[in-house]
């Protein structure tokens, strides 16, 4: 027997075909959410208040400081928040201290800062009763970036951008003549030397002293930069030039220029690199990285002992760098301090680290490498040393030293997770509040004011509310199944505020990059406009403190060349320096490599390399892909486009009534279900004392009792059924973190998205043409693919101008048969079976005398009394919404429920539908092999196996070769063997069962080695010509169900302007008869059919009414009138000032209105006069009154539509 047994949880054992030992467990899969939010609570809030406060008033008398914060107990727990459509949030109280510097008085006070949403253990937020997820954002990291473009002559031109987290951008570039320019915040160009002068290095000799005179671009720029105004010093002149670029047209003085530059770059409140920006700049400008592979043009010695570290002319390789490295970290090694002139922007001295090197293009030429000194990593603004070192890197690029940056490299893109996104939003609110506080400080009496009086929390509350309610990154959670839910929490989006937009994103940003390896899944991404912009975090990926994605590698011992079990997490930048072997490189038991050379990755190259050069090794073959993709067995045999569809469609699988975990899994099913948040997980070890369908009680080892309440038949976000079932029994011992109860789409603790039917690849009467699926009726009868769907419907009783609405059983014009399931208040009973149009909540609305309809006016004219003045506004079951009433909730202010203003009562009705699989439903396997059910065949007519077993599903064999998803065929064969052997198997991605192992399993199960079987026709009993591939495959029913899509319109709403029927099921719209359909009817010469489609059935308003009348009276259909859209066209052209007229045969203008007139239709007023003047009309036969009435009705309809 190939393979070995592996236990997944307590309840499932699989035969695993993995040959690679797992050295690292898959991490907690929703940690990306929970850890980030925890950071926000522990550090983010303090950091943010630290940035904004202390707030001083304009005179410097008062100062408001942050002391501490505290989150109180939430008002509602998670379930109550769901039930009341409320937020799961806690009151945030902040302790503030107000100091009066004149009197020395200090006041401390707790200030309420609004309700702050809390994250649930599952990594979600509950906002207005609905679960939401904050998607992590993939953005460009702050830092300094160098790029290269070629001009039209093919000469390289370099550019540099310093990007802060917030604040002004600083850019350097060379023009066509090779002169170096600077732009501040995308304004007009300025010579680079002018910015250096503004920093306090005014003379040409100062500039050459810093940079040396060996750079052509610098020398040409100095030539162009002449002293224009002798009355100003060079520094002041440069400052004014900078000011003129930033504020053109305003009067410029040296002082205002200084203040402006300080505000733009050196004021921490307006310019922020964030810790990640400082880290990136220090890394990019550090001499450690820049000296590597350069030749020294001076001898470097130990400053203390004078001992030579490296001679002049030495090439600095890794060995030399390891000796140099400790010295480069010292603040006294090769550093020079420059003091700016007194009229500079900043007066502090600038320390630079400088080392001379040979030019690679001309060894006679000596160039300088200038580092930015040792700037503290807590310094969040850009410093003059950064600007000068950045200019030096820029000048060196033109001499062939240094590298340009790839902006799609994951070393230059970082993740903003929940905590940081929240912090940024909160900061916006606090900044708005800061202005208010300052104003109030200057208005109120400094001696009596308290922190509470200064603070206005409204901007803070509004910013947080807006973020959770309407930000692009705060999304309604996909809760179709556990995989979809977990995937949503691990999603990485490049869209959203501060990110890209769909239209601007090019192909490069969307493409797979070599740094995605082990960090971002190259497969799972949506098809369509968002392709490549929305990604998924790889299985082992994690996010470091700077927001870069790290992936784990096993360290290889440099001396013994053995693979150790020590794990290092590397960012994309760090990985570029190492050679990494693949996880499937064969190893001996002691960790040494079997072969002398192995396949490895170095940068973007895949190379075969000797083992003594290997630094690291992958931890697992599945570290490349995300959890969704890792759940596809034989992924390595599928084309990537189909694998993408497979990974995406697994998220759309509907939770079934009785799901089964796949017979052929990959081993990730247990971990995926466990971490998704839908399973009930034990908090501590103990013994199960009690189990039923609603709760599990576990007695801990310390005697404490834990009670776990299970979710029963709750409606999930997607309208699916959310139900938990216990899988432990009384007396069982459970460990901490063990699965106690399965959630939806789970079985025995594992993910179970579908079923394991018997599938054959064969055609059947053409019914599986074009990916259609032939189903066995047994799957319908035995509820194999049956799912439960729960929909909620609300009805509110409001106060209207004419009086309150009322929930009641007394509904006008309604028969007793429609009221049979309503109680005295008009509310449906739980358990009632309802169909389209049935009343769920009886409700009447008072009706004003003003809005009498035509019939009532007629009745009023005839009988002279008012009908009961209420209108039926009951909540009815919409089309396709029938089912069984599962629950009814009544909300009233008397019960302490918070309702919207003007609402006296709200009733919410939940209707459950049991949907069996039917023709038109979409189904799919895990390999992107999707199709729709085309026919359900009686069990006795289905093809059957030699032992009489009917096939469950027939798939078209044509769906395999061109799509190249061969994984499904391998799964089919291995699944059949597993079914026969009564086992579950695990075939992990890139390390699964080989062809030989599948053949061995088939042999072991006593099946033919090619996995094919003779199949007999169920209708004739004759064998089919050829043997057919038969086996077991995991097959799912997807959320695209025909019940949600089928739609037909009888009488429905019309668009206001064009009077044409609306479109779409939601609007109860019509079918669009488009341009090409018109051509088709024209081609057939079906003129009259076409005419009525374009008039009566569309927007001939008067014609519609007349046709209706004609049909009722049995008269011939009149000629059509003018379509409303033609009138709209005429009016539009007239609005453009064109004299457009409609002429008759004689050439006279015709009013469009005249074409609709019909004198036979009486206006209402005329009818009322008629009735009043002829009282004996009321004694006539009913038929005559009815005839008059129908005329009134039709006329009234015409009038209403004409007004529109």
From Swiss-Prot:
The keyword Transcription applies. Its EC number is 2.7.7.6. It comes from Leuconostoc citreum (strain KM20). This is DNA-directed RNA polymerase subunit beta. GO terms for molecular function: DNA binding; DNA-directed RNA polymerase activity; ribonucleoside binding. InterPro entries: DNA-dir_RNA_pol_bsu_ext_1_sf, DNA-dir_RNA_pol_bsu_external_1, DNA-dir_RNA_pol_su2, DNA-dir_RNAP_su2_dom, DNA-dir_RNAP_su2_hyb_sf, RNA_pol_bsu_bac, RNA_pol_bsu_CS, RNA_pol_bsu_protrusion. One of its GO terms (biological process) is DNA-templated transcription. Keywords: DNA-directed RNA polymerase, Nucleotidyltransferase, Transcription, Transferase. It comes from the Bacteria. NCBIfam families: PRK00405.1, rpoB. SUPFAM superfamilies: beta and beta-prime subunits of DNA dependent RNA-polymerase. DNA-dependent RNA polymerase catalyzes the transcription of DNA into RNA using the four ribonucleoside triphosphates as substrates. The keyword Transcription applies. Pfam families: RNA_pol_Rpb2_1, RNA_pol_Rpb2_2, RNA_pol_Rpb2_3, RNA_pol_Rpb2_45, RNA_pol_Rpb2_6, RNA_pol_Rpb2_7. One of its GO terms (cellular component) is DNA-directed RNA polymerase complex. It catalyses: RNA(n) + a ribonucleoside 5'-triphosphate = RNA(n+1) + diphosphate. Belongs to the RNA polymerase beta chain family. The RNAP catalytic core consists of 2 alpha, 1 beta, 1 beta' and 1 omega subunit. When a sigma factor is associated with the core the holoenzyme is formed, which can initiate transcription.
């Amino acid at each position: 027997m190939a393979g070995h047994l592996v236990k997944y949880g307590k309840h499932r054992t699989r035969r695993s075909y993995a040959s690679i030992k797992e050295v690292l467990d898959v991490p907690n899969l929703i940690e990306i959410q929970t850890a980030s939010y925890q950071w926000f609570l522990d550090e983010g809030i303090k950091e943010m208040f630290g940035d904004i406060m202390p707030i001083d008033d304009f005179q410097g008398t008062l100062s408001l400081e942050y002391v501490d914060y505290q989150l109180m107990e939430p008002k509602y727990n998670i379930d109550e928040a769901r039930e009341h459509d409320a937020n799961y949030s806690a009151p945030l109280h902040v302790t503030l201290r107000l100091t009066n510097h004149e009197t020395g008085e200090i006041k401390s006070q707790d200030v309420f800062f609004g309700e702050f949403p809390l994250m649930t253990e599952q990594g979600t937020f509950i906002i207005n009763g609905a679960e939401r997820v904050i998607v992590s954002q993939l953005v460009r990291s702050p830092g300094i970036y160098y790029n290269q473009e070629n001009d039209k002559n093919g000469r390289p031109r370099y550019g540099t951008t310093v990007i802060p987290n917030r604040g002004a951008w600083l850019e350097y570039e060379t023009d066509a003549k090779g002169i170096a320019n600077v732009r501040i915040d995308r304004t007009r160009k300025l010579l680079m030397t002018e910015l250096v002068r503004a920093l306090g290095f005014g003379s040409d000799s100062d500039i050459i002293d810093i940079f040396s005179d060996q750079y052509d671009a610098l020398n040409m720029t100095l030539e162009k930069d002449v002293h224009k105004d002798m009355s100003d010093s060079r520094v002041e002149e440069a400052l004014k030039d900078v000011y003129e670029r930033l504020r053109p047209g305003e009067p410029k003085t040296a002082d205002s220029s200084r203040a402006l530059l300080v505000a733009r770059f050196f004021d921490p409140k307006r310019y922020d690199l964030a810790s990640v920006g400082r880290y990136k700049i220090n890394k990019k400008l550090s001499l450690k990285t820049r000296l590597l592979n350069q030749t020294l043009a001076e001898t470097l010695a130990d400053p203390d002992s004078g001992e030579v570290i490296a001679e002049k002319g030495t090439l600095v390789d890794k060995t030399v760098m390891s000796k140099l490295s400790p010295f480069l970290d010292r603040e006294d090694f090769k550093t020079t301090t420059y003091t700016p002139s007194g009229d500079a922007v900043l007066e502090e001295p600038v320390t630079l680290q400088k080392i001379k090197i040979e030019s690679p293009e001309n060894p006679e030429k000596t160039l300088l490498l200038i580092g930015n000194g040792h700037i503290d990593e807590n310094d969040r603004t850009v410093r003059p040393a950064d600007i000068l070192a950045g200019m030096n890197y820029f000048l060196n690029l033109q001499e062939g030293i240094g590298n340009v940056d790839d902006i799609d490299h994951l070393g230059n893109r970082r993740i903003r997770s929940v905590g940081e996104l929240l912090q940024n939003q909160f900061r916006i609110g606090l900044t708005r509040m800061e202005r208010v506080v300052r104003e109030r400080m200057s208005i109120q009496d400094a001696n009596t004011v308290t922190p509470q009086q200064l603070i206005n929390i409204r901007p803070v509350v509004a910013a947080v509310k807006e973020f959770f309610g309407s930000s692009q990154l705060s999304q309604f959670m996909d809760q179709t199944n556990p995989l979809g839910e977990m995937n949503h929490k691990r999603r990485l989006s490049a869209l959203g505020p501060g990110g890209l937009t769909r239209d601007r994103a090019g192909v490069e940003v969307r493409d797979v990059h070599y740094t995605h390896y082990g960090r971002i899944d190259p497969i799972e991404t949506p098809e369509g406009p968002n392709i490549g912009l929305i990604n998924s975090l790889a299985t082992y990926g994690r996010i470091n403190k700077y927001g870069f994605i790290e992936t784990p590698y096993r360290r290889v011992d440099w001396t013994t060349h053995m693979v150790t079990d020590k794990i290092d997490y590397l960012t994309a930048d760090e990985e570029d320096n190492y050679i990494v072997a693949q996880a499937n490189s064969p190893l001996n038991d002691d960790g040494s490599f079997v072969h002398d050379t192995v396949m490895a990755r170095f940068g973007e190259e895949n190379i075969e390399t000797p083992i003594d050069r290997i630094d690291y090794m992958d931890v697992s073959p599945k570290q490349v892909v995300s959890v969704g993709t890792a759940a596809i067995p034989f992924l390595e045999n599928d084309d990537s486009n189909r694998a993408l569809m497979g990974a995406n469609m697994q998220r759309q699988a509907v939770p079934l009534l009785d799901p089964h975990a796949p017979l052929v899994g990959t081993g990730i099913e247990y971990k995926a279900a466990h971490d998704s948040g839908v399973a009930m997980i034990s908090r501590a070890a103990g013994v199960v004392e009690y189990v039923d369908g609603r709760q599990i009680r576990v007695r801990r080892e310390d005697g404490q009792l834990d009670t776990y309440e299970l979710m029963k038949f709750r409606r999930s976000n997607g309208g699916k059924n959310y139900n938990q079932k216990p899988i432990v029994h009384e007396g069982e011992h459970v460990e901490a973190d063990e699965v106690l109860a399965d959630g939806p789409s789970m079985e025995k603790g594992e993910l179970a998205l579908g079923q394991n039917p018997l599938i054959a690849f064969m055609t059947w009467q053409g019914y599986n043409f074009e990916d259609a699926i032939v189903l066995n009726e047994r799957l319908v009868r035995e509820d194999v693919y049956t799912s439960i769907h729960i929909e909620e419907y609300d009805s509110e009783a409001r106060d209207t101008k004419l009086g309150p609405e009322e929930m009641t059983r007394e509904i006008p014009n309604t028969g007793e048969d429609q009221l049979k399931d309503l109680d005295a208040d008009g509310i449906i009973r739980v358990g009632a079976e309802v169909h389209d149009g049935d009343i769920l909540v009886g409700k009447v609305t008072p009706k004003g005398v003003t809005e009498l309809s035509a019939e009532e006016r007629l009745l009023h004219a005839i009988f002279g009394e008012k009908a009961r003045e209420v209108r039926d506004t009951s909540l009815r079951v919409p089309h396709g919404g029938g089912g069984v009433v599962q629950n009814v909730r009544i909300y009233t202010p008397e019960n302490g429920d918070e309702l919207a203003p003007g609402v006296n009562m709200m009733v919410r009705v939940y209707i459950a539908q049991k949907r069996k699989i039917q023709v038109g439903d979409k189904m799919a396997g895990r390999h992107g092999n999707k199709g729709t059910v085309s026919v359900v065949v009686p069990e006795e007519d289905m093809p059957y196996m030699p032992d009489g077993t009917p096939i469950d599903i027939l798939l078209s064999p044509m769906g395999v070769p061109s799509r190249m998803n061969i994984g499904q065929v391998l799964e089919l064969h291995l699944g059949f063997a597993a079914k026969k052997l009564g086992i579950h198997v695990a075939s992990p991605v890139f390390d699964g069962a080989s062809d030989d192992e599948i053949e061995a399993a088939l042999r072991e199960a006593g099946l033919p080695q090619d996995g094919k079987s003779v199949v007999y026709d169920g209708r004739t009993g004759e064998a089919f010509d050829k043997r057919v591939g038969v086996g077991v495959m995991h097959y799912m029913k997807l959320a695209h169900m025909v019940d949600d899509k089928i739609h037909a319109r009888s009488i429905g709403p019309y668009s206001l302007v064009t009077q044409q029927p609306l479109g779409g099921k939601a609007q109860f719209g019509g079918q669009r008869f488009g341009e090409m359909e018109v051509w088709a009817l024209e081609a057939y010469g079906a003129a009259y059919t076409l005419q009525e489609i374009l008039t009566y059935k569309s927007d001939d308003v008067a014609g519609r009414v007349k046709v209706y009348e004609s049909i009722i009276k049995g008269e011939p259909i009149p000629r059509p009138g003018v379509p409303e859209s033609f009138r709209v066209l005429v009016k539009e052209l007239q609005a453009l000032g064109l004299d457009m007229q409609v002429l008759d045969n004689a050439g006279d203008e015709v009013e469009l209105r005249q074409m609709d007139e019909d004198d036979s239709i009486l206006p209402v007023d005329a009818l009322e006069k008629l009735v009043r003047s002829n009282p004996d009309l009321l004694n006539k036969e009913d038929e005559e009154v009815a005839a008059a009435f129908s005329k009134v009705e039709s006329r009234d309809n015409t009038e209403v539509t004409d007004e529109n």
